[in-house]
Amino acid sequence: MSRLHPPPARAVRRRARASRSGTALLSGLVLLAPAAAAGSLVSAIPARADNPTISLNSLRTAWDAAEPDLGPAQVSASDFGRRWSTAVDGAVFAQPLVAGSTVVVATETNHVYGVSATDGRILWQRALGTPVPSSTACLSPGTGITSTPVYDKATGTVYLVAKSNENGAHFSVHALDAASGAERSGWPVTVQGDPVNSPGVPFDPGTSAQRAGLLLLNGAVYFGFASDCGVGTYVGHVAGVNTSTRKLTLWSTESGSKSQNGGVWMSGGGLVSDGSGRIFIATGNGAGEGSSPPKGPGDKPQGHFADSVVRLGVNSDGSLAPKDFFSPSNNRQLDHDDLDLGSGGPAALPTGFGTSAHPHLLVQVGKDGRIFLLDRDNLGGMGQGPNGTDAVVGTTGPYKGVWGHPGVWGGDGGYVYMIENYGSLRALKYSVNGSGNPQLTSAGTSAEGFGYASGSPVVTSNGTTSGSALVWLVYSGTGPGGQNGELRVYDPVPVNGTLKMRRSFPLGTVTRFSVPATDNGRVFVGTKDGHLIAFGRAS
């Protein structure tokens, strides 16, 4: 098995920097032939590094291939540990971002901070309105900034969505200068109005929550909406804001309905894009007959998309429209049993994991524990396989359900990692079966268990060099509220079916679905008890 070419990466000298924009990663991960893999894996190295979005890039691979200072030897060193902890106002559900030497962290009290990556000093802070009081178990005592923002390196701007309570609950899209925290001229933009496919059924901020991570694509910011912990009547939405004109567009997962659900939450995972005008989402449960797609081909989408993976296209006027979809053939049962497909965020596998017949793959997993391997160019519709089964590239499992999104490692032949709810960290090995089809097979699990809503994995490595990778994740703790959370680090390749935990570090009280950020030999984690914590070697 040949190896994946990583994105443009840092040189191996300590603290050297490289560019890792999400846009570059759309095309920067390609599989090398064996002969090429034996040579240099790293192209010319630009000047600096960033971690601009949830799971590092728009494919949502969560693979940071530019981390020679986070290798096994470095992490096992006696001086690797907590470097600093900075107190912030409010719980941190969003993954921190790294913009140059500044870590940007946002909280549920609508506070945003720029923090020095070196020593944890607060460089700037902003308050973006009063959070909305919430009595739900998901976000009590209030809802502010829940989703992971996105950083546009070209303009030095951080885009984020805040829910605030001035003159009633509403969502605002903010554009902040990453260097100072100042709001850009003409911002914020209020999310309001009717979806393009559901006129007369306006967006309702009162019953909506914005958890899915933001996507920056071709000069627009896109983000999804689901329910506030399943309370009230709601439908899913995808919104987009043009960063130049500030024009807003809305699309509903349930045309003509205000109550048939299909929320876009994905346990905080980000909307996926593999190129211009292509956006992938996963949706949650539907409410009643007709909320999930009926039997039919994916390229003839209808108007109802609960329990589905949907590929949206961006029209010339900036509006969104469904172009393809996949929904399991038992989607009505999933709806009934609260086993939504959209508890998992999708991840697009880098070019090279596929074959000539299926060159562009996507991984999707949900609450019922099945892992679907899909073709991004032909998602499969509903019931289009033999005898009305699923027309997918492959299915693995079922294992325990997943509330999270995958991590990908392109070395050692290729692996995908999942954290099971009340289960284990699971490694799935990529291969091609005897019929020439791509497949994922379970290769091993961790001996340690994970509680409800533990975070999603992140992989660091030095290119695709074998022995350089580690898998990082947040364990949700021993208590119902995230007490005694840990940052755990695992070797990426199972030995005799077991993934070895290399080290763990206490975090205090952590949030659901927490994802660490990595950059330049450091790991950054936000916590429920209001801290941003950095780990690395003493320097």
Where in the sequence are the language-model features?
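Inter-blade linker and blade-boundary elements of WD-repeat/beta-propeller domains
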Residues: 383-401, 439-447, 501-504
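A beta-strand-loop signature enriched in Asp, Gly, Thr, and Trp
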Residues: 426-460
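Cytoplasmic membrane-interface segments at the C-terminal ends of transmembrane helices
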Residues: 11-15, 442-444, 489
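Short, charged low-complexity linker/loop segments at the C-terminal edge of domains
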Residues: 435, 538-539
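Secretory targeting and sorting signals
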Residues: 2-49
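Mobile, glycine-rich extracellular loop/lid and propeptide segments
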Residues: 50-352, 360-381, 400-428, 454-461, ...
